[in-house]
Every structure is written in structure tokens, then in C-alpha cells.
Amino acid sequence: MLGAADESSVRVAVRIRPQLAKEKIEGCHICTSVTPGEPQVFLGKDKAFTFDYVFDIDSQQEQIYTQCIEKLIEGCFEGYNATVFAYGQTGAGKTYTMGTGFDVNIMEEEQGIISRAVRHLFKSIDEKKTSAIKNGLPPPEFKVNAQFLELYNEEVLDLFDTTRDIDAKNKKSNIRIHEDSTGGIYTVGVTTRTVNTEPEMMQCLKLGALSRTTASTQMNVQSSRSHAIFTIHVCQTRVCPQTDAENATDNKLISESSPMNEFETLTAKFHFVDLAGSERLKRTGATGERAKEGISINCGLLALGNVISALGDKSKRATHVPYRDSKLTRLLQDSLGGNSQTIMIACVSPSDRDFMETLNTLKYANRARNIKNKVMVNQDRASQQINALRSEITRLQMELMEYKTGKRIIDEEGVESINDMFHENAMLQTENNNLRVRIKAMQETVDALRARITQLVSEQANQVLARAGEGNEEISNMIHSYIKEIEDLRAKLLESEAVNENLRKNLTRATARSPYFSASSAFSPTILSSDKETIEIIDLAKKDLEKLKRKEKKKKKRLQKLEESGREERSVAGKDDNADTDQEKKEEKGVSEKENNELDVEENQEVSDHEDEEEEEEDEEEEDDIEGEESSDESDSESDEKANYQADLANITCEIAIKQKLIDELENSQKRLQTLKKQYEEKLMMLQHKIRDTQLERDQVLQNLGSVESYSEEKAKKVKCEYEKKLHAMNKELQRLQTAQKEHARLLKNQSQYEKQLKKLQQDVMEMKKTKVRLMKQMKEEQEKARLTESRRNREIAQLKKDQRKRDHQLRLLEAQKRNQEVVLRRKTEEVTALRRQVRPMSDKVAGKVTRKLSSSESPAPDTGSSAASGEADTSRPGTQQKMRIPVARVQALPTPTTNGTRKKYQRKGFTGRVFTSKTARMKWQLLERRVTDIIMQKMTISNMEADMNRLLRQREELTKRREKLSKRREKIVKESGEGDKSVANIIEEMESLTANIDYINDSIADCQANIMQMEEAKEEGETLDVTAVINACTLTEARYLLDHFLSMGINKGLQAAQKEAQIKVLEGRLKQTEITSATQNQLLFHMLKEKAELNPELDALLGHALQDLDGAPPENEEDSSEEDGPLHSPGSEGSTLSSDLMKLCGEVKPKNKARRRTTTQMELLYADSSEVASDTSAGDASLSGPLAPVAEGQEIGMNTETSGTSARDKELLAPSGLPSKIGSISRQSSLSEKKVPEPSPVTRRKAYEKADKPKAKEHKHSDSGASETSLSPPSSPPSRPRNELNVFNRLTVPQGTPSVQQDKSDESDSSLSEVHRGIINPFPACKGVRASPLQCVHIAEGHTKAVLCVDSTDDLLFTGSKDRTCKVWNLVTGQEIMSLGVHPNNVVSVKYCNYTSLVFTVSTSYIKVWDIRESAKCIRTLTSSGQVTLGEACSASTSRTVAIPSGESQINQIALNPTGTFLYAASGNAVRMWDLKRFQSTGKLTGHLGPVMCLTVDQISNGQDLIITGSKDHYIKMFDVTEGALGTVSPTHNFEPPHYDGIEALAIQGDNLFSGSRDNGIKKWDLAQKGLLQQVPNAHKDWVCALGLVPGHPVLLSGCRGGILKLWNVDTFVPVGEMRGHDSPINAICVNSTHVFTAADDRTVRIWKAHNLQDGQLSDTGDLGEDIASN
């Protein structure tokens, strides 16, 4: 049975690691201290934390294990689960403490917890087995299993699984986490290894530790990049330990049978958890995979912290515990608040640079102490049943005993009750105890009186002697002693008489019951072992008989003396005899008790069959003793004494007779034994005589043989030889027989044991067979039950999902109806209000009062739909806001007409209640607002303090490095020139000043830490404000009021933050431009000075000295400069490291020319005639970096996307944007005139202009697309800035300071309302290095005013759809736009063209427009997502953008045509609708997805059968086979497993291969024939994969991402072929025709590419692709 749940708190130990050498060198101070002898740690000056264990810097591994873990291992043998997990920041010593980082050269004293626990475990197992064998018990059986899990990037990996691919760590694992019926957590799909010895376990630990993911960061050389959980399962089968009471009960039950051992099975699991450390990316310097791992680690630790907070915070214990937020907390569920003894080891760093991490760790650890676990013993069901039956047996035995003793009775009606005798016995026992106390008190009184009598009698005798003149002190003492002895003897005599009287009565009763004890059976000859024992027993019995006879004589003599002394004492003593007789009786009673005890012992030795009767006699004797005492107190007559002595004599006489009989029996037995002995001896003598006669006969025969002389000597020798041979053979036979006899005797002796063992084993086998049959039957039943349960649950889940879908559909319908009703109701209310004003007009004054009152009290907000609509109206038409406020206020103030006649009364009540509620709500809102403001200010203060502390730490680190450099320089100078050098003194003085600065900074750090601690304490105290009470006390109306204000405050705060951010970005852009300009001017100045310095040595020396002084100073903002790797430096480094720029310019430091750089360098600006050489040199250097150059680094050059709009190609063609416009124009003109570079496109020049004009563009950032546009468009991309393309070429000539009026107009209104201009396809300028490019951009199509979302093409035509609500048709032969297909309700998200029918299909919101472009752009039909068909245009072309989707419709994300053009498939919602284009009818739907279908592609399997592949936001890809004429709902034929980690964005089919791109940045390759995954690239791009396409004429896959990068992949090997920057904004679509590739992007252009240098999917030229990346 499971033991009662025992609440055990999570125990917390804090371990402070020693300081690292690096921290000591950098001057880090220790900010922790430990109270000696107390588990208390101080952080900073006075912030104390108390834990269960605290281990200081000098603590050893053995100490930690002994104090914390040893008890948990012992508890595992009793069936208790245990967990040890190390928690703390990275580099705090968790892996070292746990011992999961296996090191071969580790010393024994440095071994971690796991190694010591394993040794302790197996040592205890051996000890328990040895102890059981010594005690004669069956040894316990142990089964030890081990598991080693790793939680990497929220995926559970099995470190014991040797078959898994170590490189595929990001692949989804098949391990599942489940919870059993008792709340325990177990895993499915994990490798479990059975181990029997310590070396095996250590080998398993070693293998798992070597497979664990580790990497190097700036804070830790070998940092754990995953959470590790090493689990040991111990299963123990042992003999059930029994208590003394159970032993006694069992002995009574099985006293006649052999004892049977009962076994119990205990299980326990021990988790050793090594958590990865919490990280700050700034400090670890993690990028790429390391950064993702750090984010995943922090997410898991955040979930763990939330669980600890929910369990440890007393106010949150009733709330939900978020175990399922992370797999880490799910695995540790039973360790935190479950069935486990848990110890948390918080590892912290003592250095002050880790102050905040240490503080947070200690806070979480302190909170974890409040977690209560419910610990219980883990037993199997059989052991639980045995324990339950034992307790039941014990209870029933107690109940049976109570029935036997009469405590419980059952009356006539069957009702159980307590017997009155029990209560009476309890009362009598109480009374008996009281009487015993009284007797004891009376005994003390008697002793005192006896002493007093003795004293008085002795004094009286002394007086008599004194009168006679014979008084002497010795005589008086002698008299006193005699009198005392007489008194004692008299008391003993009285006691003996009373005892004898009782014994006489008992004997009389016993004789009447059984006159003979039949004791002869006890002394029967069968029991007596030998004659000696029998003789001894007889002698003892005779001695006892003699003693009894002597005692009888003494009793007779004493009786006579008593009679004589009685006569004398009656005449002398008088009244005092009563007390004396009492004392004498008591003394005699004591003597008689001793004698009686001796007699009892003798009788017990002789008569063993009557022990029970003697116990009853003793009880009666005790009762009679009390009666005897009472009688001795009452009667003192001599007749009673005589009667007692006579009874005693009779008793002794009876005993003598009995013992005489016993002696006679013993003597008879002895005589019989002697007779048997004599007969045995006679028979023995007879056998000996017979043996002697046989020997004599043998000798006589031999003598006769020797006396025969007739035989010859030869014959005698022959006979003798034969006889000797026979004799020798017989001797051998005799020896053999003797050996066989011994063996036979031994076998006979062992046969019984073997038979017993055989029977026992046969019984065990039969029991095991029965058990096996029973278990198999039970397993089958359980499996059948589980199967039925699973099927029932699946049906229930399916039904619930179906019901949920129905409810959701009904809910959407109801919401739409509600919105319509609200609109109608609002209009009706306004009409009613207007009619009332006409009937009963109100004065302006009164109306103004009402308006002001309602506006000041902030009338409750309307419904969400109306508020959203009013929000739109307010933002788009701010001028009408004040006009609309008064009518709306009146509508809200006046209630709707009611059917009864009490409208005015109802109105007054509602109005007064609303004012009162508003006032109360306003007070509550002010309280909450103040609290929110306080929290914000506290967090800002703490954040500022942390920033100050980090700044101080950086300063201290910088000063420490400078001091180290000076120290090394001093040592060098001392070695070279001795200590007498003056420079040594200067260096020492400078070092002293640096030390003083470091000390000052340390004091500042300490003050900052103290302030942070005070703020933390204030925050903790402030959190106790009962804000929840205020919220709980709110009514529904007040809650709406508060929610409205919270929403308004959130919007205002967000607006303020956005404005501040925009201002910051503008200022950053200006600052960066200023810095670049300043740097360029400084470089020009230095260049001029350097030319002069060649002629002036003093100036040269001065410049060199300045360079040396500036060389030693590192950049102030080292982190920022390290993160921004590009040609432009960060603001912090630009101003402070002028020397590096100057040295680069002078050639003293060679710049690291990176392969991707295509910007004009400063050397090229200064030496215009050498630019070609520089570019060639850079190209040559770039060619060494390999075929694949990374593109992402081009985005990390320190500029934001909004502040640096110039692409890499523009930077090559134009001057740096930081230079003034004149310089840029001069350089551009010179380059055009001298080198004849082709003129860049208008967009290119416009970008260069717009960068300078950025502040003005910031003000017009708002567009009418809004948030709803981005939510409706398939892939959410960064918002693009709407610009007007009215006069692209003239805009370049506008002066820099004058804003564009047309642009302002474009931003104020929708772009579709402006004049539609024809687009044009321009040739794209060729650049250097394009020969190594796999794709070459040959043309660019410009004409859309907003982002291009979709594209389709043939060999002659190009179709593009955009956010500007138009679809343009382009002629690829002439390069002109030939038509624009109308204005759509919203964004055109998909476009398809049918070659067979010349129809164009465009998609916008829930509509599909069908265009016939053979004669003119004419919409012939409109299809809807619900399956409706309308001739012509169903949605009229409105001037405003339509965001709302009609009720019953859903957003259409993409459409696709089958190869024959007969069927159209439209992805709307989570289904795909099929359209028969011959009849323009909807024939059915493809269902099965749980999320919206984002993309689809169609292929033809055979004639009349289409293959449709769909990708959804639910991460899954499904395949449908649709035959011609299929109707209704079609289910998927296959689901591709495993799914992506995020929604699917693009699909492409090539033969039997399917390619899928997802928002998880990965691309997967599937086999359509085998329906399985072939290959995958988890991080193919650094952002969403938005589009896929196949390069025409080559087995190459092209992928485009949201970052604007294009990558090429070999279709067969799935190896990357190349990458390039396709656009400066997200790529939305890719399509191909027979010769070209088309890419559409958010930059409002479509680029046309041609395959170049591709042969069979490989690059023909091994040159670097970086040139093309930069050029594009």
C-alpha cells in the first residue's frame, strides 16, 4: 500500500564557486559572504538569504555529497523518488557539481555527485545482500536501469541512442512525455540500459556525456548548450520487514508450520538534472546557432521560474501551475510539487560582475524552498495488497480479542456495542490502583508506627533498668535491637500466616478439581536422556522431600512455641498486640511468599503440564492475600493462628504425598531402564562370544591347513598365492563396499532434503505458471480495455472537433449578424434621437452641460466592432471627431424606448447610477494607474542602475587591462635598464593613479549594488499592495470602464513609443551621416598632412606620436563595435578610434577587404584614378573565399533598414550617402563621363535621393493599408513605405531641401486613386563580376506603386498583382505594360493565366475575378470563396479599400490551375474549393487541414486525374488525388510526415520530387512516389522561405526569403549552388517560363533573371559569388 503522503519541502543548497583566474586578473571583487556555522549567505552588504545548506568558495565535492545527497540514495532503497538539479547562470559550476561533463583525467576528490551516487548505490546493494545472507534471509534482488536525456532546443534527445544522427539535432524527436494515473511522469521511446555494476553505469554516463551538446562562449569555454537529465531506476524485491507485533501474530498463526517469507517490490527513480545556464547574449557574444540555443535555454528556464513562482508563492498556489509551457518543466513535474524528495543546488558566482544573475538565482532558490512535495513509497500492487491485508488482519485480531475478552458484544438486534463488564473492569482497575496507593501509604504508616513502638518499648525497658540501677548504654542498645527484631519477626509471622491460609484454600480447591497431576508423563522414560539425568532428578526430588519434612517439623515446633508465647504475651502486652500481630503477620507473609515461590519453582520444574492452573492459583492467591491482610487487621485471636498453622501443615503433608508419588514413579522408570540396559548388555556379550568363537574357528582352520604335510611345497605356495589374491580382491571389494555404504548413507541423508527442495521448486513453478496465465489474461483484458477506451476517446474527440467547428461557424455567423444589427441599431437610435430633438428641442446651454458632463466622465466604450470602426474614423478623419462626439454622447445617455410607461423614471435611475459608478471607477482607475506608473518607474530605475553597473564594470575592465599593460612594460624596462630609469617611476605613478581609479569604481559598483538591493526590496514590499482586491471588487460596468482606459493608455503609450523610436532612428541616421562626413574630412585632412609630412620630419614625428597615443586606447563601446562588422563603424568606435581610420588611409594597417564589399572605399575616394586597381584587387581577394559567400552579414553593418536604404549595388555606383550631395554628384558625373558606366535605373537614383530626404518621409509613414492589410496578406512582411511614382525622373532633380508635394498627396490618399501610369521593363545595368554569378538580372519591371505580391508568366506575357489593388499585364517582347486589370477590393494576392482559354484569374479578399484579355480588360465572372458565381463584377470598384470580408466568406490565399486548364483550385480558409471551368461551377472541396491553406500546387498524374499538394499554417503538407467528375468533399490520400515547425509558404514539384518552404526558415525535399522525406535543410535561409521555383533548363531549385536573398540548390543532391541578394525587401513570389526567372518583391519591382554559368546544377566557374551578391 502506498504510504500516506508526507509533505516534504524542496531543500535548497547554495554553492558559491571560486573566482576564476580571469576574474581575478580583471579585478572583480567578491560580493558574497557566508555566515560561519549558519546556512546563510549575504549578497552585497546586508542582503541576507537563508537556505537549507550553504557551501562557500572552499567547499569540496565530498562535503556537498555527504550533507545533501547521501540521504536521498538511502531513501531510494525504501522506495522514495529523489531529484537533484543544479540551477544557475552559465559558468557557475553546475556541470562540475553534478559530474555530467565527463573528464578522463579527473581526480577522485573532484568527482561529481552522479559518480559518487553511483558508487554509493552499488555499495549499498552489496551490503544489503550480504546482510540478508548473514541473517539467514533470501538476499534481495535489485534491477538497476539508466536513462540519459538531453533537452536541446525544446527537443528531447536520447543520449543512449546509438542509431540517431548526431548532426540532425534540430530534427523532431519521437520521444513522448506522458503522465500515469498517480501523477507520475514517464517517457516513451527512450533507450533504457540495464546495468549490474558500477563500471557499467560509469561507462553509460561517459557515453552519454560525450554525446552531449557543448560549445564555447565568451563566458564559458565549455558551455552546456542543453539541459541533461540522467535518471536511475531502482527496482528492489526484498523480504517484507515485520514489526514485533506482527511477528508475535505470525508466530501464533503459523506456530505448527514452517515460516514463509513474504516479499515486497519497491521502485524508485533518481533524477540528476544538469540545467544549462541562463545567458545574456551581450555577455556570451553568442550568434547564429549559439544565440538560438541561448534563447531556447532561457525560454526553458523562464518556464521553470514560472513553475517555481506558481508553486512557491503562497498567494499563487491555488492558480494553475504551467508545467506544459516547456518540456523541461513537464519532465520535472513530479520533482516540483509531486512525489519526490528534491534538492535544488543553486550555483552562483561570487564576482560582482555577475551580481544581477546571482541575485536572481538566489531569489528563485529562496522561492523554491516554499514548494511542498508529496512524498510516498512506490510499491507494486502485490506489496500494497499484502500490507493492506496485514493491517486488516491486525485489525480483525484486535477485534476478535475484544470479542473474546467481552469488551465487544452483539445484542439481540445485531447491534455492536461495548460490554458493561469492560467499563466495570476499567473502574475496578482504577479502584485497584487507588487501593494499591493506599496500601503503600498504610505500609509506610505501619513502618513508622513500628519504629515508634520499638522506641517506646526500649525506652520503657531502659527506665525499668534505670530504676533497678542496672542501666547501661550497651544494654539499652541491645534491648532496642532485640525489640526491633522481635517486631520484624512478628510482622513476618503474621504475613506468613495469611499467605499459608490462602495457599491452603487454593490447594483445597486444586485437589478438589484434579487430585492427581498425572505428572508421570512428564518424567516418562522417553524424555529422560540418560541414567545420570534420571538419578539426578530422583536425588533432587528426595532432597525436596527431606526439606518438606524438616519444614513440617519446624512448623510443629513453631506452633508449640507460639502457643506458649501467646499465653505470656496476653498477660504482658495488652492492647499493643494488635499492631504487633499485624506486623508479624506481614513479616510472616513475606517469608511464606518466598517459601511459596521456591515451592512453585520446584513444582514448575517437576510439573510442566499445569502452568495455566498455577497462574490461576497465583491470581487467587493475590486476591486471598488482600483478604488475608484485611482479616489479619480484624482478627488477632490465637485460634486463627493455629488454624493457619494446621492448614499449612496439611498443605505440606499433601505436597509430601504428591512428591512421594513422583519419586516412586521415577524409581519405577529407573528400574525399567536398568532392566532394558541389562538385557542389551547380555545380548552384546552374546554377540561378542559368537565373534570370539568365529575367530577361534578361523585360527583352527589355518592351523589345520599349516599342519597338513601331504601337500607339496609348490602346491602350498600356489594355494597361498591364490588365497592372498582372493584376500586382496576381497579387501578391495570390502573397501569399495564401505565407500559405497558411506555414499549411500550420505545420499539417504540428503535425499529427504532434495525431495523437500524438489517439491518446493515444483510448487513455485506451478505458482509461476498460474501467475503467468493470470497475468497474460489480465494483459489481454487491459489491452482490450485500452483499445476500446482509445477508440471511444477518438470518437469523442472527433465529435467534439466537429461540434467545435460547428460552434465556431455559428459564432462567426452570430458575430456578423450582431455587427449588422449594431449598425442598424445605431442608425435607428440616431434617427430616434434626431426625431426627439425635433419634437422636444433642448437649449444649447443645457445640451452643452450634458455634453460636458458625459465627456468628462468618460462614457463607457461601445462594442468592439463599433470601437474599431470609430478608431478608424478617428485616425482617418480627425477633423470630424469633435462633430461626432455630441450625438454619440446623447445616444449613450438616452436609453432606448421601452414598452412600459416608465421611461423617464428608468432614465433618471440609470443616469444617476452611471454617474456614481463612473466616479468609483475613476478612483479605481487612478489607483491602478498610479500602481502601473510606480512599477514602470521601478523597472526603469533598476534598468538604469544595471546599465550604470555594466558601464562601471567595463570601465574597471579597461583600467585593469591598462594597468596590466603598464605592469608588463615596467617589467620589460626593469629587465632592460634597471629600476633607476625615470620611466619606471612614471609608470609606477600612473599605475597608482589607475589603482585609485579602480578602487573608486569598485566603491561605485558596491553603492550601485546596494541601491539595486534596496530597489528589489522596495519592489517586493510594493508588490504586496492589494491591487487584485481592487480589480475583484469591480462591477461589470466598472471593469469595462477600466478596460477601456487600459486600452486607451496602451494605445497612447504605443504611439509615444513609436514616435520616440522614429525620432531616435532619424537622429541616429543624422548622427551616422555626420560621423561619416567627419571621418571622411578627418581622413582627407590627415592625407593632406601626410603629404606635407614627407617634406617636414617634425610633422611626420608628430603624426606618428599621435598614432601611438591613440593606438593604446580601445574603443569605449566594445560590444557595439564587435557586433557591427562592416565598412561603417559604430558611433562609439567612430569618434574614439580615429587612429585606425588614419592608419588605414596611410597604409600602416592593411584593411581586411571582405569578398562581399562593393562600396567605394576611402582610398578610392581619395585616389579616383586608382579605383579600378582597388576594385580589381578586392575582387582578386574575394575570389579566395570560396564559392558561397554569406549574404546576411551585409545586413549587419550597423545601419537600420529604414536608415540605410541604399543597397550594395547602389553603393558601388554612387558615392557614400554620408557625403554631401555635391560630392556625390561630382563623383557620379565623373564616373559616368570617364568610365561610361551605364546609367542606373530611376529606382536606383531615387533610393539615393530618398535616403537624404528621410526625415520628411518619416512624417508620411502612415498608409491606408493598415494592420488589416498585413493580416490579410499571405506572408506578413515588414511594412513598406508607399511612394508615388508620378514623375520618377523629375523627382531626381528636385533640390534636397524641398519636399515633394506629390509624395505627400500619395501618402494621404490611396495609391489607386492617383493617375494610373504605364509600367515599363528596363534593362538592368551589368556590373563587374557577373561572370561568376549563377543567375544574372537582365531586366527590371517597374510600374506598381506598392509591393508586388504575385506573378505569373508565359513566354510572351507577364502578369503581376500588387498591394495597389491592380493586376498588370506586360508584353515581354516590347517591354511595355499593355493593360491594367481594374481596381480590386484589396490586395491582389494571386494571379494565374490559362493558355488554352486566354483567361486571367485574379484573387482579392474572398473573390476570384475572371478576365478575358483577348479584346479588352473585361471581367466576365466573379467567383466567391463560398462557391457562388456572379456574371460580371460582383464587387464594384470602390475608391476606398475594402477590408471587411462578407459573412459566410473567407480569405482566399492562393489559386492554381490544372495543366489542362479545365479545373481551378482555390485555397480559402482551411479547405480548397474545386471549380469546373467548363461550366464555372463549384464541384466540391478538399478538406483535412486544421489551419488556413497558404499555398498549393497542381500536377497531372494521368489523363483526367489531378494531383494536388497543399500546405497550411498547421505545419502539415497533404496530398489529394482528384479524378475528373469528383464531387463533394475529398479527403487527403496522404499526410507528409514529419511536419515543418511553422506554416508552409511555398511548394514546387519537379518530377517525383516535391519541395516545400516554410516560415521555420527550412526547405524539405519529399519523394512523391514513396511518400516520404528525402532530405531537409533546417536553416536554409535566415528568414521565412516565401517562394520556390525551378530554374528553366537546369536541375536547380531557386528559393527566395523574406530577407530578399535568393539561393540555388541542386535538385538531386540538395547541395547549395549559390546565393545572392535578389531584392532589398522581402521576396513574395517566383515564377518561370521557358527561358527566364521572375521574382516579385516588396520594393514594387519584378526582376527578370537568366541562368548563367550553370551546368547540370553546378557552377561552371569556381569564382566567388560575392561579386554578384554585391552587384545585385
UniProtKB/Swiss-Prot annotation:
Residues with PTM Phosphothreonine: T1662
Region feature Disordered, mapped onto this chain: 556-646, 780-808, 836-886, 1109-1139, 1172-1315
Species this protein is from: Mus musculus
Tissues expressing the protein: Widely expressed, with highest expression in brain.
Pfam hit, one: Kinesin
Residues covered by the Kinesin motor domain: 9-371
WD repeat coordinates: 1343-1380, 1383-1421, 1447-1485, 1488-1530, 1539-1576, 1580-1619, 1622-1659
Name used for this protein in its record: Kinesin-like protein KIF21A
Biased composition (Polar residues): 853-869, 1198-1207
Bias kind Acidic residues: ranges: 598-639, 1116-1125
Result after altering L1165Q: Decreases the binding affinity for KANK1 by 20-fold
Residue span of region Interaction with KANK1 and KANK2: 1142-1169, 1148-1169
Role noted for this protein: Processive microtubule plus-end directed motor protein involved in neuronal axon guidance. Is recruited by KANK1 to cortical microtubule stabilizing complexes (CMSCs) at focal adhesions (FAs) rims where it promotes microtubule capture and stability. Controls microtubule polymerization rate at axonal growth cones and suppresses microtubule growth without inducing microtubule disassembly once it reaches the cell cortex.
Keyword Coiled coil in record: yes
Family: Belongs to the TRAFAC class myosin-kinesin ATPase superfamily. Kinesin family.
Sample GO molecular function, one term: plus-end-directed microtubule motor activity
Phosphoserine sites (modified residues): S258, S524, S1227, S1231, S1241, S1660, S1671
Coiled-coil intervals, chain numbering: 365-840, 933-1021, 1055-1085
